[in-house]
């Protein structure tokens, strides 16, 4: 706690927007303008969504790979209908749910803790939705969003290529790519690309992976390792995460597809591959009015109030002090 108290003022100072940005944050003015516009778009667009309805389906599977043999360890399918509201409680109706554990059970069953799992399907359009694979709780798990204010302290940026896509309506939209480059080798920092609509700067696509794999002995608190033998050091590597958005009502970019491919490992003899896909469809979106700044109501899908970036820096500094 003493170390934490000494470092906290330094961490908060690093968040101060009045402090100068690192000189290598952007290679050119084009990149700086793209980052500025993408940040501003969140205030103009996604936060104005007042309600939406959509259907969602999710499939995930966990395998086990040992002694040159692959087996299915766990599989799950969920389907639901979402009625989301920004300013009042939302509703989600489960249409179907089943899970199978082939190595232990002969038949599929209704998933345990279904209530919590279904909640994770709800998307708040105003959130930085980069915590794929984690629940929508107040925990600090997940990736540090690059475009958060002060993100330049953890990331560098570079404008990439532009491309044109055609929608079923015949409308053509130009996309601009933004490369995300982590400053540190940490599993909570992402490396990849974001594509934005050149007109509205709404997020259209994201493809990324962590800066490095997660390592139990490197990335957990000492208290979590006390009762674990020293030779045990499981690792987890996310191969890729993909987010794709669709344009609805010719205005709102809403999440329509999520995919993640990962693998856990224990040495060279045991692998646990994981695959998840989630599809949102049948959107009906309403909006146009800003939220009440005095309201304390938290819409469904809100991912906690804590600043993940600040927590990341605190943990990083504590880790350095403990190693010293």
Describe the function of each predicted region.
Residues 206, 256-260:
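Beta-strand-dense domains in secreted/periplasmic systems and polymorphic toxin scaffolds
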Residues 228-232, 244:
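Beta-strand-rich interaction surfaces with strong enrichment in secreted/lumenal proteins
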Residues 247-257, 269:
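Transmembrane beta-barrel wall of Gram-negative outer-membrane proteins
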Residues 196-198, 240-249:
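Extended lipid/amphipathic-ligand handling interfaces
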